[in-house]
Amino acid sequence: MTHQTHAYHMVNPSPWPLTGALSALLMTSGLTMWFHFNSMTLLTLGLTTNMLTMYQWWRDIIRESTFQGHHTPNVQKGLRYGMILFIISEVLFFTGFFWAFYHSSLAPTPELGGCWPPTGIHPLNPLEVPLLNTSVLLASGVSITWAHHSLMEGNRNHMLQALFITISLGVYFTLLQASEYYEAPFTISDGVYGSTFFVATGFHGLHVIIGSTFLIVCFFRQLKFHFTSNHHFGFEAAAWYWHFVDVVWLFLYVSIYWWGS
């Protein structure tokens, strides 16, 4: 920043966008290979290269922001807009899944027995594990807000405690969801009900895993004193993402579990 006359961060050439794109190609190709030929080699390679890319790319960003001071208020504003646009794109993703669900359920075809849930499908009880999952995610929304307020007030210990509680609740949610999938009386191949249920809830579950990873990174960064009350966009972005995951689950619960059953 010493030799610059502007507040913008001119990033150095980086290999990570290229390796990230290649890992995404490997993952999608690997997923196809897994589904059709039961081979997980490409998928494993794709996931490994993706994890390595993410680690090294985020390491570079942390170095530039925390240790080199490149993330000025103008740069942070750009990152905020980027995160907002990313969350909007995710909203549109889920809109597609809800559209597929309501398109199929509001006008069930004769092939489905003219009813919803389709003939032969035994839906999950919305007042059992799904309701517990809802309360777990709502509680995690409260604890992430507590963490944010603690950070703004400079209370590091409370922030770490609240963040740990949020991560624990996220992991608990994932385990509950996995057990629900394991015990579900229908599969993803059980027609349009199975496919819409597992794709929508599974995609949300993937977001919970991503959000939990995001928060774990924030937890370890805070252990190393990376965040201050006026410079903590990494944590703020994680909190926004977590609230988004919360809200999507409420819509999933009301639509697919409660109304759809």
Curated annotation (Swiss-Prot):
It is found in: Mitochondrion inner membrane. Residues 1-15, 67-72, 153-155, 224-232 are mitochondrial matrix. Keywords: Membrane, Mitochondrion, Mitochondrion inner membrane, Translocase, Transmembrane, Transmembrane helix. It is a multi-pass membrane protein. Its EC number is 7.1.1.9. Signal peptide: none annotated. The keyword Translocase applies. CDD domains: Cyt_c_Oxidase_III. Component of the cytochrome c oxidase, the last enzyme in the mitochondrial electron transport chain which drives oxidative phosphorylation. The respiratory chain contains 3 multisubunit complexes succinate dehydrogenase (complex II, CII), ubiquinol-cytochrome c oxidoreductase (cytochrome b-c1 complex, complex III, CIII) and cytochrome c oxidase (complex IV, CIV), that cooperate to transfer electrons derived from NADH and succinate to molecular oxygen, creating an electrochemical gradient over the inner membrane that drives transmembrane transport and the ATP synthase. Component of the cytochrome c oxidase (complex IV, CIV), a multisubunit enzyme composed of 14 subunits. The complex is composed of a catalytic core of 3 subunits MT-CO1, MT-CO2 and MT-CO3, encoded in the mitochondrial DNA, and 11 supernumerary subunits COX4I, COX5A, COX5B, COX6A, COX6B, COX6C, COX7A, COX7B, COX7C, COX8 and NDUFA4, which are encoded in the nuclear genome. This is Cytochrome c oxidase subunit 3. The gene is MT-CO3.
